[in-house]
Amino acid sequence: MLGLPTETEDDMKGIAHLAQKIAETYYEVVPKEQRRGKVQINVSTSFFVPKPFTPFQWAPMFREEDFIEKAKVVKNEIRSQLNQRSIRYNWHEPDVTVLEGFLARGDRRCSKVILKAY
């Protein structure tokens, strides 16, 4: 998950480092003759949406552009890794995340907006 209020750039890069460590462990543990080709690791992140009645309910939500920048930090860190071809990275669409935040924090007045948009 990206976009937590306490998140640092090291936290974001840590996602890529964990994927790299998993790939390295595979090559260390599985004997070469037992491997079925190269390892393929799928890394997927979603973006934090503050929800009511949780410790982060009053935390601000990032803008769409900020979410994309955070995803690019992870993507660029994966590209700099030794096993970059073994790791695929995708992320949740930021516009859907913003909509989710609107629905999660909105009240009954949101229904008019939803009806008009639909």
Predicted regions and their residues:
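A structural motif corresponding to the C-terminal lobe/cap of the Radical SAM core domain
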Residues: 1-118
